[in-house]
Amino acid sequence: MKDKVCIFNAESDATAIELNVCDADVTINRATDSTLSVTIPVAKNVNAGSDKGTLYVSQTKRPPLFSRRQKIEISVPEHIVPALRLNARHCNISVEGGIYGEVNMICESGTIRIENTDADSVEINGGRLDIDVESSTLKGSLYINARTAEFLAQNTFAGLAVVRTRKGNMGIVALNTKECTLETDDGNITATLKGKREDFCLKTTEKAGNTVADGCLKSKNFNAYTAKGSIVVDFIEDERAADELAFADEGQNANLSEEENKAS
């Protein structure tokens, strides 16, 4: 038997989306029309609404013990949402598509997947996390700080990328970035960077003291550290990599101009 759900439609020009959830599967995806909507289970502990331009979803308490995980779905139209804020415990979070300003997530444990998403910046803080960022454009920064984390970024652009964890492996595949720092006290780091080797200042430190450093000034910087583990770095020479920053800026400016025209 299907769970009963409630659909809440909000103002499409929301300035923020805010969630406070626990033991839930949360999906934030691109809407098929211009409606900003939330689908939540019919339950006493879950509610949704809007206030002063902020769409919110909150759980007043945890679901009953041994009950099925609650499913929450938010559909976002194709325009910029200036802020996405999420405070979660034991949740699976998926952001698929959309254009955002600042994305801020605090998650005690669970999985976070960001795919085909544009954002000015993404910041994730938490405890035990499995994080996957794929085919996304982060104009500003990607910042992750977790107690334990398995991290993977694929085919993604980030002006600045910083990932720190006490324990866990990190992998990046075809990441285009000007500056990247990966740090784990216990884990392996595998990185494939877009660009030519000679364009990067490279510094890697592994096994408590084995350091390799260029000691140079170049257009891009990559730093990696592991106290217990190994570091492998490779490069993909892609002529388009140098232009992605310009393309990202043009795309963001075009989106902002479109929003300003709509507002006027």
Where are these regions (language model features)?
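Intrinsically disordered, low-complexity terminal regions
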Residues: 1-264
